[in-house]
Amino acid sequence: MNSADGGRGAHGLDVFDGDGLIGYGHASLLPALGGLLRTGELDNGIHHALAVNMPAGMLSKAQHFVWPARAADGTADITYQGDNPALAMGTLLAIPRTVDLSAMTWRTPQGRVLAEAAQRYGWYVVDVLLAPHKVQLGIDVAAARSDLGFDIDPATGRQSVDTTKVDPDGLDLDIALIASLLHAIPQAAA
């Protein structure tokens, strides 16, 4: 399989061959390709867990990572300030099955699909954000363009959004609603 970087992911590791444990691009050392939102999934359904970045200040200051994560940020002792020991790098977050998603008001159809995936498969914490009150999902560049209409001009770094494909403000509100419903699924310490 070829790519613009010769099949190499973060840190120059080959992400297409091997045991699937190399090619990480996250502080958690989880595989870079795992959990990405892929082209067509917002229309056809998401059938796997998603990767999510959480605010560093929310992650546990007591326990920095749990399996399947193999590490945490090098600055975790300073930047992880959360009091919930269940919220660490590698934590699986999910919406409880008792929550009726059909009874909620979704601002975008994409938000509802993301909520269904969060309830059925969960979201794994794979990295951190500096923004204190947001979460960020991993998304394939092609999916960002085709499914959401998001694009970045490589020359200028400017972002553009095709609002005929998605209401970006509505999607942000939907993701914030999903984040408010998520609960940590207990896991063994790494």
Region locations from a protein language model:
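A surface/extracellular/periplasmic glyco- and lipid-processing/surface-interacting theme
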Residues: 1-114, 119, 123-129, 142
